[in-house]
Amino acid sequence: MIRYSIAAKEDLPRIVEIYNQSILTKQSTADVTPVTIEDKLAWFEAHDPKKRPLWIMQEAGVIIGWISLSDFYGRPAYDRTVEISIYIDETYQHRGIGQYAMDFVEKQLPGLGIETVLAFIFDSNQASQRLFEKNGYCLWGATA
């Protein structure tokens, strides 16, 4: 069973470890070299549990992934809009955990006052595209 909780500073090393796995695949992030805990500290601290949470996902006490809701575009008109990021440890991928994460987030949105969610997904990341499309998201900005 997956347990969700607000990320604490002591979770940051594992969050960074999972993030760095995605850099190697070139599927999920524009970073091209591994990041450090220090590199992600300001990003971590920008998350507010009441407005822009960062959750960890645990199974049997092990952090297997994380979910971030971040500001979009930084202008007041977008206060009810967030960018979602879901990162899952490579050994736990392709087990339906992304869908569990989507279901969890969907239930949290009303309490956070969020009306619009968007995700930046690389064209090569077909698994993420399918996950979001399956959950009613539309593809925008793709080129032929």
PLM regions and their residue ranges:
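Conserved GNAT-fold acetyl-CoA-binding loop/helix
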Residues: 16, 20-43
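Conserved active-site tyrosine of GNAT-family acetyltransferases
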Residues: 19, 132, 137
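A short beta-loop-alpha structural element at the N-terminal edge
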Residues: 3-15
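Active-site acidic-Proline motif in GNAT/NAT acetyltransferases
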Residues: 86-91, 95, 107, 123-124
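Acetyl-CoA-dependent GNAT
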Residues: 33-91, 102
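Conserved catalytic-core motifs of GNAT/GCN5-like acyltransferases
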Residues: 118-121, 138-144
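Conserved acetyl-CoA-binding loop-helix of GNAT-fold acetyltransferases
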Residues: 94-108, 129-134
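Conserved GNAT acetyl-CoA-binding A-motif
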Residues: 109-121, 129
